[in-house]
Amino acid sequence: MRLSEILAVALVTGATAYDLPDNLKQIYEKHKGKCSKVYQKGFTNGGHSDGKSFEYCGDIEGAIFMHSSAKGGQYTNMDVDCDGANNSAGKCSNDPSGQGVTAFKDEVKKFGIPDLDANLHPYIVFGNEEHSPQFKPQKYGMEPLSVMAVVCNGKLHYGIWGDTNGGTSTGEASLSMAELCFPEEKPDGDHGHDDNDVLYIGFTGKDAVLERVPLEGKKTEDFEDSIKSIGDKLVAGLKA
C-alpha cells in the first residue's frame, strides 16, 4: 500500500478499538502459560514486580512476543515512552526519562519528518540494547518501522516498531499507544498501565514492512486506521 492510498483510507475510516479475531483470542490464552522457544530471557517489566522473568518468545510462527514465566505465565505491562520529536510536549511534559531521539530516527527521516512523535505515532518499544542481556529483533527477521499488533484491555490495536530500550526493561509503548489502549487510565509521561496483561506481537518478514509509512498524519486514530489492513492480514496469518 502506497502513501497516497494509506492517507485516503485514513480520511474515510473512523477511530475505534478493534475486536479480537478468534485466532488471536486463542493465541492470547494459549501462550500466556509457558514459552517453549525462548529467544532471550532475563528482562524486567521496568518495575520491581516479577523480577527478571520477562523474555522474548518465538512460539508463534512468524512472530515474536513478550512473555513472563512468573505467576504461572503472563505477558507484560505498558510503560509510557515519550522519546522522539516533541518529547516534552503535552502529556509527555512530566516524563522523567524522555530522550529527544528514537532508535530509528535515521530510518524515519526517509519519510520526511525528523523523528517519531510519541504524542502522535502509536509505536512500540521492542528489543534491548547497550546492557546485558540484549535482544535484537532484526536477528530474527523483524524490521524497523514494521507493523506490530498489541492486545490490550481486551481489544486489538496496531502500531509500529518505533524504538528500542537501552536497558533491560520491557513493556513500553508511546504515549499515543497507551492512550489508545487505556484511555480510562489517563496515561501520561510518568504513568502507564501496570498490569502484566498486554501482549505485544512483532512480525517477521517483509509483509510487515510498509512501502510508505503515513507519518505525516495529524491524528493517532488516522494513523492506526491507515495500517489496519496490513495488520489484519498479518494477524489472520497467525496460528495458535
Curated annotation (Swiss-Prot):
InterPro entries: Chitosanase_fungal. Residues 1-17 form the signal peptide. Its main location: secreted. It is found in: Secreted. Its EC number is 3.2.1.132. Keywords: Carbohydrate metabolism, Glycoprotein, Glycosidase, Hydrolase, Polysaccharide degradation, Secreted, Signal. GO terms for molecular function: chitosanase activity. GO terms for biological process: polysaccharide catabolic process. It is an enzyme of class 3 (hydrolase). GO terms for cellular component: extracellular region. It comes from the Eukaryota. Chitosanase catalyzing the endo-type cleavage of chitosan, the deacylated form of chitin. Chitosanase may be crucial in the degradation of the deacetylated portion of chitin in the fungal cell wall. Chitoolisaccharides produced by the hydrolysis of partially N-acetylated chitosan are known to have many biological activities, including antibacterial activity, immune-enhancing effects, and elicitor activity. Belongs to the glycosyl hydrolase 75 family. This is Endo-chitosanase B. It comes from Aspergillus oryzae (Yellow koji mold). The lineage of its organism: Eukaryota, Fungi, Dikarya, Ascomycota, Pezizomycotina.
